[in-house]
Amino acid sequence: IESALDESDLVIDASPSGIGIKNKKLFYEPRDIMSIYQGGEAIEGDNAVSDMLFNSRVNYNDAVGKKHVMQGSCNVTGMGRILEPLRKNFGSSIKRFDVTLVRRWADIEQTDENVTDTIELTQSPHHGEDVKSYFGKDSPLFVRAIKVPTRQMHLHIMDIRFKENTPSVDEIHNTFKDEYGVATLWSAKGTKDIRDFAGKLNFSF
């Protein structure tokens, strides 16, 4: 890997959780190479790969000039894409966000990991703190996660509470009308319908 790094300006580190920090210290920092890490790494403590968790919808400009940046997990990225437009449009009128993550047990390509026939609840998963790293620690965001025995996909259930006047359904939908990476489906009954629709658009899972 050293010879390839000597010819590189930027590394996208997709190694397993905890390996990114080792690669940073062993390979990237000595060569002064810019690096992007995936969500399994940390942004706080001795094992932090960066002091910034990146979300293109929230803090794109803040990443300019950074040597090391961590890209959030798919769940953390998805929450940012949905919640940030609501924050921008309705701001101080929002009382709190309550998010329930229904997480798949294992990714489709993780064939070596068995899907256990059980359901697990995590009251305070890391996803909430990860999102607060770019929303602000005082953001009224409350997250819990339920892990279910499927490989299909993740599902987010979001309850947005407003202080007084609640926006109409049309106002909420219009918030996402021009959002990149967000689609409104009226006929999907379940995650399979969403996957089938995404497949027709040539999205990769």
Where are these regions (language model features)?
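N-terminal Rossmann-like NAD(P) cofactor-binding subdomain of oxidoreductases
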Residues: 1-108
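C-terminal substrate-binding/catalytic lobe of Rossmann-fold NAD(P)-dependent oxidoreductases
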Residues: 1, 93-96, 100-101, 107-205
